[in-house]
């Protein structure tokens, strides 16, 4: 009876685990963006928090011969800040304008939901692979 290559289970787990790790990093950055969405600069006329964007990269795991996903660079979004006229705000410049972060919480929440779904998909792969491995072991034992 041929049970396939046991390394196939390891490969599946390796790819899914790399996806889990990448999505955790993505969710961390998105959470940071949301947490800072209403912050202002520490000094009058200064720049507030700037939205961060995560990139991913694909790397070859030479020991297994599979591509895994890695958290790439974390870049800053260069789009304009939101400017509100609030002369009484301590962060206001000489004209009474306050810069707010270039974070759109609706976009961040959408990205967060997407990251959660990707995380869940990778977790389902880990769970299914573990079950298949356990069934294979049970068949071999009997």
Language-model features: where?
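Amphipathic alpha-helical polymerization modules
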Residues: 1-142
């Amino acid at each position: 009876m041929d049970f396939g290559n046991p390394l196939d289970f390891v490969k599946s787990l390796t790819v899914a685990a790399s996806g889990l790790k990448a999505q955790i990093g993505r969710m961390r950055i998105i959470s940071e963006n949301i947490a800072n969405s209403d912050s202002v600069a520490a000094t009058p006329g200064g720049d507030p928090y700037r939205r961060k964007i995560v990139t991913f990269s694909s790397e070859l795991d030479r020991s297994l011969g599979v591509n895994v996903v890695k958290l790439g660079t974390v870049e800053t979004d260069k789009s304009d800040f939101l400017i509100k006229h609030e002369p009484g705000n301590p962060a206001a410049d000489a004209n009474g304008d306050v810069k707010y972060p270039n974070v759109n919480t609706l976009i961040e929440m959408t990205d967060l939901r997407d990251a959660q779904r990707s995380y869940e998909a990778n977790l389902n792969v880990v769970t299914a692979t573990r079950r298949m491995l356990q069934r294979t072991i049970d068949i071999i034992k009997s």
